[in-house]
Amino acid sequence: MITLYEAAASKGHYQAINNLYLLYTNGHGASGTLYAPQPSRARKWLHYGLDKNWAMANYWLFDALYEGNAGYRHNPKLGLAYLQKAVDLGVPLAQYELARIYDKRFKDYNTRERLLDCAARQGFSAAMNELSRVKRIRYGNLKESLQLMHNALRYGGEGGGEAALKLTMVYAKNKALMDKFIATPADPVREAAYAELEKALMGTGTKSGNPFYTFPRLDEVLPLPPAKTRWKGIYSAMSKEDAAFYQNPPDTAALAADILKRGIVKKEEVYWTPRKD
């Protein structure tokens, strides 16, 4: 996967560069394998984003300064200044991160909610998922909480996967962690559908998920009650492109081998030994 990201990044692909910065910073491989962080590689792509004047690069710089990543000295105060800049430029991940800081450090719940709302309005599923929890626990607004979880799932991502898991519980007979929805009747069709969507995004113990899936047709095939479901399997909620990919995923190993053979990416640029600890 690193080879594929590097190949896309060499063409200026924004999402691939974002993934590489985070990957080289945290050292978490897609299969769960841990690697030693690669500060010089993370710094390379951080500087690329800054040179391109990307708003998201301000968030990467916040992360580097606040945590001492990518070869930067630990400087939380300066890091927070770049986080605020990213927030002002409308970066939803930055808005979400600052909302968490206002929550945990300052207990300023009103500012937290305003920031989460800003990120949610841009389709950031993690913010929708968190805002759903706020509506449910702080205000007891189950209708709005349910809608936010549903919206988060439509946009995919880890936030969408977590929302799908919660929705599975909402429509199960045993509500588990979602006991505030005790009055919601069990619905086996919806429960199974949300479970299928959660596995696609988050994976299982033996198969990795794909958080990049989105479900633009979710409202058509799996609308919230009282509307009836038209569920015909996960493909019915996906775009045609995602459905084709889900049914016949490409051979990533073969793609990576071809990229290396063509010299688009050099082997030494992607070789990364796992940590032994």
Describe the predicted segments one by one:
Residues 2-3, 31-45, 71-82, 105-115, ...:
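Structural signature of tandem alpha-helical TPR/SEL1-like repeats
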Residues 7-8, 47-49, 85-86, 116-119, ...:
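Canonical positions in the second alpha-helix
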Residues 10-15, 20, 27-28, 51-56, ...:
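Short helix-capping/linker turns of helical repeat alpha-solenoids
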Residues 32-35, 48-52, 60-89, 94-107:
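Extended amphipathic alpha-helical coiled-coil/heptad-repeat regions
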Residues 118, 146-158, 168-176, 181-205:
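TPR/TPR-like (Sel1-like) alpha-helical repeat modules
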Residues 184-238, 242:
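Extracytoplasmic and endomembrane cell-envelope/extracellular-matrix remodeling and assembly machinery
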Residues 217-277:
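Long C-terminal extensions of eukaryotic subunits of large macromolecular complexes
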